[in-house]
Amino acid sequence: MTSSDSGSAVPRLVIAAPSSGSGKTTVATGLMAALTARGLAVSPHKVGPDYIDPGYHALATGRVGRNLDAYLCGPELVGPLFLHGARGCDIAVVEGVMGLYDGAAGEGELASTAQVAKLLRAPVVLVVDASSQSRSVAALVHGFVSWDPEVRIGGVILNKVASDRHEALLREAVDSVGVPVLGVLRRAAPVETPSRHLGLVPVAERGSDAVDAVAAMGARVADGCDLEALVGLARSTGALSCAAWDAGEALVSSPPPPLPVPSPGAAPPDPLVRPGRPRPQAPDGLRRRVAMASGAAFTFSYAEHTELLAAAGAEVVTFDPLRDEELPEGTQGLVIGGGFPEVYASELSANEGLRKSVAELAFSGAPVAAECAGLLYLCRELDGLPMCGVLDAAARMSKRLTLGYRDAVAVSDSALAVAGTRMRGHEFHRTVVEPGAGAAPAWGMRAPERRVEGFVERGVHASYLHTHWAAEPGVARRFVERCRTS
């Protein structure tokens, strides 16, 4: 099979389930691996904001795992972002989130797998945990098929099937609903995918064990599923009417904020540093070097952030805070995303050279964007261990899980946004920072409750809030312009 002539018509499937824990991650990742092993170029996608599953998807396919989140980015960007990721691919596999019809709390279908399937005009394959039922599976499947006629459930994969007789009973029941059974996975020891306080352990921390786990998922799906039928179902989709997202075009189309009004007698503003203007070539012909944290402690990042920074004129280089003793030479801006600094607090604290390098850059006024784990790293201490000391705040682990979507507005002008900029984000952590906000907070939260959060100091913007810059491309442009002027 060759790549689709029209990217908008790429064959595609959505792997969903009635609820979490049904096996959709195993099936989705295994299907990606099985199709890749057959020589297909597979585009991997994940519904929702989760950073960890896309790492397994990337391992299965050899391509960047990408998120499709209608809450963070808006429904209008789901199709374009999907097509951007699927360029040049033979087929796309989209792993759902939670149950098929579960979305943002109190928002109807918003951010649900069902909504994304409809936006992509993609058939859904329902993964059903059949371990404790037989004929009742027909009622369950019938309910999911009939709940929303706009959602096309094209087949079922039965998981945790006990025996040949159990399989026969299940097939007979599902046949009565008129939905084909596209796979049967027998009850077996689960593939080794260890979890901890925030879900699966990321790929970056598991090394060869993650490779083995993905291979096992692929073998299980290849043995138990009708791959030809699944590919045929994926090919039954039509073209999408939207165009693929492009980072450069997004920057051009994103409206710039107004120029500041100069004070009397002040020199006119330099047009090269107009906030929000599509990036002109810098006078010295150089791109601005932005260092981005990576490695086992900082694995949470959306690929579009790097693409937007590059389109805005940055040279993005990665570094590992666990191993590198200083920031990359010539660093002019710093991005520290999410991850698990609490797991690696001792190692991060022991790397005094890098902590000093980060602090020096931050205190120089250079732009620093830190989300969640990045916020913790910039604090004075984490669980009593010294961190970078950029923020006069202390972080500690907590038993309480903070989780959910947030509506936010920028409270203070910063390296990322002008005050009043509205964005949507999500929080996902088991830590506490005290105080929770600085004299100049980063965000004012409007939902689910009103509060201020985060820190804006010098060029630093640090917050628990994870955002998706594709929803507000001017964030990347403003950050790179700040690199140019700091």
From Swiss-Prot:
Gene3D superfamilies: 3.40.50.880, P-loop containing nucleotide triphosphate hydrolases (3.40.50.300). Keywords: ATP-binding, Cobalamin biosynthesis, Glutamine amidotransferase, Ligase, Magnesium, Nucleotide-binding. It comes from the Bacteria. One of its GO terms (biological process) is cobalamin biosynthetic process. NCBIfam families: PRK01077.1. Its cofactor is Mg(2+). It is an enzyme of class 6 (ligase). The active site is at 372 (nucleophile). InterPro entries: CbiA/CobB_synth, Class_I_gatase-like, CobQ/CobB/MinD/ParA_Nub-bd_dom, GATase_3, P-loop_NTPase. It comes from Streptomyces coelicolor (strain ATCC BAA-471 / A3(2) / M145). One of its GO terms (molecular function) is cobyrinic acid a,c-diamide synthase activity. Its EC number is 6.3.5.9. It holds the Pfam family CbiA. Disulfide bonds: none annotated. This is Hydrogenobyrinate a,c-diamide synthase. The record marks 466 as: Increases nucleophilicity of active site Cys. Catalyzes the ATP-dependent amidation of the two carboxylate groups at positions a and c of hydrogenobyrinate, using either L-glutamine or ammonia as the nitrogen source. Residues 289-474 form the GATase cobBQ-type domain. It catalyses: hydrogenobyrinate + 2 L-glutamine + 2 ATP + 2 H2O = hydrogenobyrinate a,c-diamide + 2 L-glutamate + 2 ADP + 2 phosphate + 2 H(+). Belongs to the CobB/CbiA family. The a and c carboxylates of hydrogenobyrinate are activated for nucleophilic attack via formation of a phosphorylated intermediate by ATP. CobB catalyzes first the amidation of the c-carboxylate, and then that of the a-carboxylate. Residues 254-284 are annotated as: Disordered. Pathway: Cofactor biosynthesis; adenosylcobalamin biosynthesis; cob(II)yrinate a,c-diamide from precorrin-2 (aerobic route): step 9/10.
